[in-house]
Amino acid sequence: IAHWPAGINVSKNFISREPCHLIDFVPTFMELAGEGVSYPKYLPSLDGISLTPTFAGKKLEREKPLFFQYGGWNVLRQNQWKLVQRKQENWQLYNLDRDRTETSNLADQFPDRVKQMIRAWQSWATEIGIGNEKSKKGS
């Protein structure tokens, strides 16, 4: 939810369906702060993107997937695809463009996509230091 009458140029009650994550806040705030504000070079690079295009009703141009791990859930969101695993169970795949409520698991129909997304998730988990918690099921 965002409220900024002077900076958000969309119709009243506009809802953006663009996925975003906490990692997008710093790039967004830095862009809003304007020129002269730069991210410190001694810190790790930012994975997020600025959300400001959504303030004008535009789509985001996200190149990297979004990764989450919380409360025993492992999640990768890549465009319309969402790969989900709960507490070491089998991975589930959903097409959010067609199934926003995640009722139709498509993992059996798209095994190659599932394998590719699991590899991406495991690579991310190892990179950030949670590699020992990665799933063996479905890989």
Identify the role of each PLM range:
Residues 1-3:
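Short glycine- and hydrophobic/aromatic-rich loop-to-beta-strand nucleating segment
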Residues 119:
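Basic, alpha-helical interaction scaffolds
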Residues 114:
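Glycine/Thr-rich phosphate-binding loops that ligate phosphate moieties of nucleotide
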Residues 7-14, 18-96, 124-139:
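C-terminal cap/loop subdomain of S1 sulfatases and analogous C-terminal strand-loop tails that border
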Residues 104-111:
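Active-site-proximal N-terminal segment of extracellular/periplasmic enzymes that hydrolyze or transfer
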Residues 99:
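Intrinsically disordered, low-complexity polar regions and short flexible loop motifs
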